Amino acid sequence: MKNNVVVVTGVPGVGSTTVMQKAMDKLIEEKISYKMVNFGSMMFEVAKEEGLAEERDQMRKLNPETQKRIQKMAGRKIAELSKHSPVAVDTHSTVKTPKGYLPGLPAWVLNELNPDMVIVVETDGDEILMRRMGDESRNRDLETTKSIEEHQFMNRCAAMAYGVLTGATVKIVKNKNGLVDNAVEELISVLR
């Protein structure tokens, strides 16, 4: 297997987790196995253990220093996993906070993970807005299509910066409404 660490990113509601899970399921049928790790879940485990958050979406509102410390601890845990098997990390390129965009993979996390590839899952802002409005399982801040598109632009910028710093390739995968299988096939084609 040529990829030891692959990072799959996207704004909340774009469907990056769904695309990644479906791709992993199909790759297993081909005897290609990645360990799936959700960076936010790893961070939430740390935050919950420290009594800093009771639900995952509260982490966005923690002060930046606390978020950075939690990121570093989660990055170390994932780096340990990648020493034993290829890892696909489900995360966000950037996290929108009240004080601005926080890099999802700052230098101290990138240095640990050293990804081979960064994948950015995207679609139109209005599609994401509609998906978010229909998802009652999450406590998300309401945003406009324009602010979602700005967030996707910031994700692209961050992904390229991650590539510059690590030598990772950057791939954009489109996840249009009703065409998730196309996005899955596009992701699989670069993970083989």
Swiss-Prot record:
Gene3D superfamilies hit by this protein: P-loop containing nucleotide triphosphate hydrolases
Similarity comment text for this entry: Belongs to the archaeal adenylate kinase family.
NCBIfam families the record matches: PRK04040.1
Gene Ontology molecular function: adenylate kinase activity; ATP binding
Alphabetized InterPro entries for the sequence: Adenylate_kinase_AdkA, P-loop_NTPase
Binding annotation for ATP: G10, V11, P12, G13, V14, G15, S16, T17, T18
Catalytic activity: AMP + ATP = 2 ADP
Protein name: Adenylate kinase
Domain of life, per lineage: Archaea
Upper taxonomic lineage: Archaea, Methanobacteriati, Methanobacteriota, Methanomada group, Methanococci
Residues spanning the membrane: none
Enzyme Commission designation: 2.7.4.3
Subunit structure comment from the entry: Monomer.
UniProt keyword annotation of ATP-binding present: yes
Record keywords: ATP-binding, Cytoplasm, Kinase, Nucleotide-binding, Transferase
Record's subcellular location: Cytoplasm
